[in-house]
Amino acid sequence: MFPELNSLLGAGTDTVERGKFTLLCDSKTDGSFLVHHFLSYYLRAGCRVCFVALVQSFSHYSIVAQKLGVNLSSAKDEGQLVFLEGLRSYTDLLFGDNPEAEVTNPLCFLRAGSDLKPLYSFVSAALAPSAGQSWKCPVLILDDVSVLLSLGVPPLQLLDFMHYCRATVCTQYQGNVVCLVHGAEESGDEEKELLRRSLSHQSQVILWAEGLSSGFCKEVHGQLKIFRGAVSSGKKRGQTQPEIYQYKIQDKHVTFFARGLSAAVL
């Protein structure tokens, strides 16, 4: 995890806020570093995590997590981490010859053209409370949910899935949901933009990573906007003024600073 980002969010590993839906967005940059932060943060905080990875392999996340001081393989073995490797599941679905395995595949809806109930059932079962567990709270992390749009899932079905996930994990289980949606500004993808806007109205916190309008800079890799509390306060998102920080990504951590106050500039 990135301690400076925890400080900006007022988060710590001793106590974890519950019932929160956090939306991660990016535009003209890659916001994946935010996913790695939350994955390592919740594991180090002692939460049980269900991670739905739709864009990268387990080894990719494991290598990054190792740099952040978290061993994903150990977390899986101990039952703290339930990892769905979407790339492998989708490959098995397309090229596998085992009908029984296809039925139990959480992504079987992609072939059947049905709703996302199999994936929801997987998430719900993975995070359901059970006797003897000592984890602080259940957490669902999805990276990147907009990939399902490109695989043919209608936006309304995807929004229904997210609604049920929030109702189950955040309300029923008193846990948290973190979801990444890549920006659609460059591609003009209307469905992706609809998904992002709809989820933004349902979230308590939005972290939005943006590329610099001035272009590439060696010492400043982008800026992060933090929107808070629009759902709980009843305000519209546009009425909520974001906190804005610039950042530089390094090998094992990310440095944040106020706009124009990079050490290279000063």
Swiss-Prot record:
GO CC list: cytoplasm; elongator holoenzyme complex; nucleus
Pathway(s) of this molecule: tRNA modification; 5-methoxycarbonylmethyl-2-thiouridine-tRNA biosynthesis
Keywords: Cytoplasm, Nucleus, tRNA processing
Superkingdom of this protein's organism: Eukaryota
Subunit (UniProt): Component of the elongator complex.
Signal peptide: none
Biological process per Gene Ontology, one example term: tRNA wobble uridine modification
Chief site of localization: cytoplasm
Family, similarity comment: Belongs to the ELP6 family.
Gene this protein is translated from: elp6
Functional note: Component of the elongator complex which is required for multiple tRNA modifications, including mcm5U (5-methoxycarbonylmethyl uridine), mcm5s2U (5-methoxycarbonylmethyl-2-thiouridine), and ncm5U (5-carbamoylmethyl uridine). The elongator complex catalyzes formation of carboxymethyluridine in the wobble base at position 34 in tRNAs.
Record's keyword annotation contains Nuclease: no
A Pfam family of this chain: ELP6
Designated name of the protein: Elongator complex protein 6
Cellular location(s): Cytoplasm; Nucleus
InterPro entries on file: ELP6 (IPR018627), P-loop_NTPase (IPR027417)
Keyword Cytoplasm: yes
